[in-house]
Amino acid sequence: MSVATSGISDSVLGVSTAIHAWEASASGSLTADELKNWVSERIAAHESAIAALLAVEGVRTPENSLRLYDIALEQLNLAGAQAGVLNSVAADKEVRDQAQDEAQRIAQAGTALSLNREVYGALSAIDLSAASDATRHFVERTLLSYRLAGVDKDDATRAHLNQLHEKATLLSLQFSRNIQEGAKTIVVHNADQLDGLPADYLARHTPNCDGHFVLSTDQPDMQPVMTFAKSDDLRERMFLAYNTRAYPANQQILMDLLATRQEIATLLGFSSWANLATADQMMGSAANVRSFIARLEEASRTGAEREYGMVLEYARKQQPGLKVMNAASRGYWYEQYRREAFAFDSQSVRPYFPYAQVEQGVLDTAAKLFGVHFKRSSAPGWHEDVSVFDVLDIDGETLVGRFYLDMHPRDGKDKWFSATPVVTGVRGRYLPEAGLICNFPRPEMNEAGVVTDAGLMQYNDVVTYFHEFGHLMHAILGGQTEWAGLSGFATEGDFIEVPSQMLEEFFRDVALLQSFARHFETGEVLPAELIQKMKLAGAFGRADWVRSQLYYTTLSLDLHDQDPTGIDLDKVTKSLYESLQPWQWIEGNRMYASFGHLMGYSSNYYTYAFDKVIALDFFAQFDPANLLGCAAATKYRKAVIEQGGSRPGRQMVRDFLGRDEEFSAFSDWLNEEFAAAGTRA
């Protein structure tokens, strides 16, 4: 799916014809050495483009200089994206290990580029007098990133920064790998402890030869236990197993990483890593993040106290003498309360959400919203589990991208839910490709082709699918830009969760849900009455959800907004939790060791809550009677999604809304359950 442009092709750059690392194998099964060679070709192409950039004579223009820089960036992005994918999904551990090594090597090349004074000088000299706004934005943002990297420091300081970034990358990769491969199991000796779990869950978990049941901390095993299991003991065991799956390995790694990041920030003249990490974001500074946190705290405090009080009152009726509810009881007691207050049992909708129908529903929704078509492709993926789809524009013929769905758990695979670039799109050169790496329940068939397990999903799973697909469409439709450096996800980091959280909101529409939510056995459409109960029950607990986001947001900021020397991670996480959460802390909880967002987002986990405010304001502009076909849908694609990173996030907000985001839509969403009258059973 590559197209040569500007007289520069992959062959000229000296790379193989395989744009995908998993196709660079003579045998059809990628080896560690073949991956290493594939990455080496891409790094060599990157270096060739930089050499050509520095050799340009005369007046520097976007086409003779920025184009070469962008191609160099494109080659690093390509190598980095696919090394990252294989690090997360490769079935062969040797390939995963090699992918991690390659990710480190690619990061080193990126750091060297960011500290290259000659390149900075060349980019600074580009004549932008006739350049487009997007080109100006690209150059200005790139030059800022160079200054924030320390390109203006002396040779010794830049060498030290290079070493520190190399160390930080290695620590981050190892932290993530420990989470990925850190799954634990718990053994259930008594079947009575499984009471409350769905029938299809029990059917998948038959006793072993000793008569015991073995459960894992993978999402399809863990989430139902935390939501439905009546046994306090089982929930607490699962909670602790899940929150210690990368402990103690990641404890010291995190401490070392915090110290390394702080040293980088200090060398660059910042008081903390948080101030460095927010300097080129929409938020701008750690102080602005704290102001936002304070506003969220005030907005959610009363609602969260009310929600907890109502659930606790109900729980005490079920368990007389109960004083407090602990962290392992949160999902369970919310589920029980919703059954009582709203006559809604979340198990009741699971039969309407078999995986295959949900997938089709998400595809159909996105196709209508964005005016595209999806066509299953025979192109190879990185594993036999992967489904591949081509994206066609509104005419049904023009190919605009491709995506890969790797949606179910397997050994060695990353345990979370994420969207990832695969090929960075550049207009006229590469069509964009992206992938989803998820862990939804796997449908099963017997040898006769009869479905034995439909892979029933909880409604929160369906919301997650919509969320990740929002990222995917951002990568594809935003990947038609002139420059790789502005393609797809290349917005400010604290704008990136807007498209994902926007698409979540479409799950609340009755007509949209009924278009795909059908009972896996009878074909019955999900009743409107049940949808209404689901929506009302789902609205209850939003303030509590915001408090959870506040906890993660404040923790990520606090860890990076001070000198980490002497930080006691156990004390910090517990103390902060108890200041924000009414649910009793469980001793032995080491959640920080598996808080993977500390790697990619570092101090900036606030992105989720900040972008929720923007996304809800965006969604409020859509016509509820015609969500997928209203004028706002077309405007959203044009003004936001298709832009990729071609405009600053602040400008995209103003282009779509005609103003800055406001808090009112978020406040309405937050208080929706309490604002509605006569909604309880």
What is the meaning of each model-derived region?
Residues S2-L197:
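N-terminal helix-rich structural modules
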Residues I19-E34, A83-E102, S124-Q163, S216-Q251, ...:
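Short His/Asp/Glu-rich catalytic/ion-coordination signatures at enzyme active sites or charged loops
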Residues E74-V85, E140, L144, L240, ...:
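Short, hydrophobic/amphipathic alpha-helical patches that form generic packing surfaces
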Residues A149, A156-L170, P354-G361, T607-F610, ...:
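Charge-rich, well-structured scaffold segments of protease-associated domains
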Residues Q251-Q262, E433-C438, Q480, Q643-G645:
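Short, hydrophobic/aliphatic alpha-helical segments
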Residues P441-F466:
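Short pre-active-site segment immediately N-terminal to the catalytic Zn-binding motif
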